[in-house]
């Protein structure tokens, strides 16, 4: 397989890609993935011994409960009780990291009662994706192997392996039918080759207008992508301000997400970027979302000359010089784990409190005296939660305690990963262990799933960033309960719609059997 034959979205080397399998073909369809899944931007670690234990327990417990409820294992695992079963299994292996009651797993009504507790919670997903209808690059099919119904109607059955899984119908199903997401921010990515753009700036705004018109409420907001150093890039900024009116900007300081780019740049480049900040602030579009972290194992070689642009060494000065500008750092700048043993990362944190690149971000507010830098959790919450929940709690806890609970925002990087519901449930249930709190001298716990801290992370922080009236959120959520998307969801569930539990992307081969049950 040559590099040109590798699927789009894969920045791993040919050898590294050959060490992977498509997740939905080989991975056990658990409500929570039982090994790290990668979207192709970073190397998935092999399934750890603890993850194998979790998988064994989920199967064992699910078989028992499914039989008792006269269901198949797959049917049971698609229920709220099945989700609870997965968290119980994780707690048995990792210690009590997630708040879950055994009654949820055994009693469908008890699981339903817990689900009702979260009805109406405002959840704003700060990072979501789909592709344009005329996208022709079939290489994108390598990013996932999805074979569930792509329409709102769950009876549509299996669909061919085509790009339709990445398009709006499936996006609406995964984001709004199969999860508790209330509002989604639609994003995109620039590429040196314009043929690879997933969505143009016009397509992003057209999609948002279409969905909001159909819903009868504001369910989607959109980015405009900026491309510093491209010829005449500021002309597109002017057009976006005048015609498109996005809620925020999006870009990659590394230039191209999947390889060395001639357009890498820095946030603190005074000549290049400061005129843009001035223009953005004047237009009232004063939030920019920047991809940081999330690099492949061989990033120093694969992104030679540009990888340092994926760190946060350009954030502090820019934020200090432009206090009216908000800088949302995607993936919380976390450098993916490079070792095959994830406990090595936790061991480093236990030793010195440092998490690669993410801690550098968390220290910026105090170091530079700024309050306009935010950490977003897309992809990195998912990968750490399923690989080492204790590390995940430390990672999120450090962001919350060093940056403040007002400066951490929820994002999932869906639809690449399928439905974000398991991520939402993991965040609702996650807590920082007391020994970590004491050793680090932290004061802020994550708290209840509908408590102050998690409500801020899930949606209220983004509501402020994107100029949604926080005081009207409660009333808006009530309207969301009765808009067209809510009606579609009610019909979908009434017809038997359920999560597929399909994990998308890539997993490490590590000798496992192909399995889908």
Where are the predicted features?
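Hydrophobic faces of well-ordered beta-strands that scaffold small-molecule active sites
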Residues: 124-128, 184-186, 220-224, 249-250, ...
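Active-site gating loops and adjacent loop-to-helix segments of metal-dependent hydrolytic enzymes
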Residues: 46, 53, 132-166, 260, ...
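Divalent metal-dependent hydrolysis catalytic cores, especially in the metallo-beta-lactamase
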Residues: 126, 145-164, 173-196, 219-225, ...
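N-terminal secretory signal peptides
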Residues: 1-71
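Active-site gating/metal-coordination segments in enzymes
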Residues: 190-310
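Mid-to-C-terminal alpha-helical segments outside catalytic/metal-binding sites
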Residues: 71-88, 111-113, 138, 152-174, ...
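N-terminal twin-arginine translocation
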Residues: 63-78, 86-111
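Catalytic pocket-lining loop regions of alpha/beta-barrel enzymes
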Residues: 140, 258, 263-410, 418, ...
């Amino acid at each position: 397989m040559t590099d040109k034959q590798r699927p789009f979205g894969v920045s791993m080397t040919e050898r590294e890609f050959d060490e992977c399998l498509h997740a939905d073909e080989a991975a056990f369809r658990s409500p929570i993935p039982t090994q790290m899944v990668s979207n192709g931007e970073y190397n998935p670690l092999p399934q750890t011994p603890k993850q194998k234990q979790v998988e064994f327990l989920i199967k064992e417990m699910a078989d028992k409960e499914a039989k008792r409820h006269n269901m198949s294992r797959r049917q049971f695992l698609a229920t709220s009780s099945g989700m609870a079963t997965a968290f119980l299994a994780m707690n048995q292996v990792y210690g009590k990291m997630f708040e879950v009651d055994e009654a949820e797993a055994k009693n469908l009504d008890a699981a339903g009662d817990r689900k009702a507790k979260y009805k109406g919670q405002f959840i704003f997903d700060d990072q979501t994706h789909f592709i344009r209808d005329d996208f022709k690059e079939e290489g994108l099919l390598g990013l996932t192997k999805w074979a569930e119904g792509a329409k709102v109607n769950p009876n549509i059955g299996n669909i061919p392996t085509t790009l339709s899984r990445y398009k709006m119908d499936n996006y609406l199903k995964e984001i709004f039918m199969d999860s508790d997401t209330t509002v989604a921010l639609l994003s995109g990515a620039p590429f040196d080759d314009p043929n690879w753009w997933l969505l143009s700036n016009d397509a992003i705004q057209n999609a948002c207008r279409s969905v909001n018109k159909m819903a009868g409420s504001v369910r989607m907001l959109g980015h405009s992508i900026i491309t510093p150093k491209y010829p005449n890039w500021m002309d597109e900024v002017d057009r976006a301000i005048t015609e498109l009116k996005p809620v925020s900007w999006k870009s990659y300081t590394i230039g191209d997400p999947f390889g060395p780019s001639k357009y890498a740049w820095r946030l603190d480049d005074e000549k290049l970027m400061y005129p843009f900040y001035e223009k953005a602030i004047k237009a009232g579009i004063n939030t920019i979302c920047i991809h940081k972290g999330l690099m492949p194992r061989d990033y120093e070689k694969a992104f030679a000359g540009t990888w340092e642009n994926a760190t946060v060494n350009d954030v502090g000065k820019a934020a200090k010089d432009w206090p009216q500008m908000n800088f949302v750092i995607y993936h919380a700048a976390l450098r993916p784990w490079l070792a095959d043993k994830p406990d090595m990362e936790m061991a480093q944190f236990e030793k010195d409190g440092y998490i690669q690149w993410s801690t550098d971000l968390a220290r910026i507010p105090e170091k530079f005296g700024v309050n306009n830098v935010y950490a977003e959790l897309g992809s990195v919450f998912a990968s750490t939660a399923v690989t080492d929940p204790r590390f995940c709690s430390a990672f999120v806890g450090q962001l919350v305690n060093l940056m403040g609970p007002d400066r951490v925002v929820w994002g999932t990087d869906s639809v690449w990963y399928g439905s974000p519901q398991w991520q939402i449930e993991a965040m609702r249930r996650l807590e920082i262990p007391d020994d970590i709190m004491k050793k680090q001298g932290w004061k802020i716990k994550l708290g209840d799933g509908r408590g102050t801290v998690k409500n801020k992370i899930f949606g209220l922080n983004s509501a402020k960033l994107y100029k949604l009236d926080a005081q009207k959120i409660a009333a808006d959520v009530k309207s969301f309960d009765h808009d067209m998307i809510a009606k579609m969801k009610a019909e979908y569930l009434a017809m038997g719609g359920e999560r597929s539990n399909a994990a998308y992307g890539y997993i490490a081969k590590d000798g496992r059997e192909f399995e889908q049950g």
